[in-house]
Amino acid sequence: MAVEKVNSSSSLAEVIDRILDKGIVIDAWVRVSLVGIELLSIEARIVIASVETYLKYAEAVGLTAQAAVPSV
């Protein structure tokens, strides 16, 4: 995948369109502990993409119900 370099500035609409077209995944992991005792642990995976992009890549890695059912 080649990186495109554009000299002009991008508008917000172009940036949002590109994010929805390509998709973005944010993994977050937070742990709060006091004196070695874990008080709070948060794990999150946030996916931002269009439905079409999500289904395209989710099926490839087996995250959809259709991909989870073995073919007969």
From Swiss-Prot:
Protein location: Gas vesicle shell
Domain of life (superkingdom): Bacteria
Keyword Membrane carried by entry: no
Presence of keyword Thylakoid: no
A GO cellular component annotation in the UniProt record: gas vesicle shell
Broad class of the protein's primary localization: other
Pfam family, one: Gas_vesicle
Alphabetical list of InterPro entries matching this protein: Gas-vesicle_GvpA-like, Gas_vesicle_GvpA, GvpA, GvpA-like_CS
Extent of the signal sequence: none
Keywords: Gas vesicle
GO molecular function: structural molecule activity
PANTHER family tied to this protein: GAS VESICLE PROTEIN A1, GAS VESICLE STRUCTURAL PROTEIN 2-RELATED
Similarity comment: Belongs to the gas vesicle GvpA family.
Job description of the protein: Gas vesicles are hollow, gas filled proteinaceous nanostructures found in some microorganisms. During planktonic growth they allow positioning of the organism at a favorable depth for light or nutrient acquisition. GvpA forms the protein shell.
Oligomer status and interactors: The gas vesicle shell is 2 nm thick and consists of a single layer of this protein. It forms helical ribs nearly perpendicular to the long axis of the vesicle.
Protein name per its UniProtKB record: Gas vesicle protein A
Lineage: Bacteria, Bacillati, Cyanobacteriota, Cyanophyceae, Oscillatoriophycideae
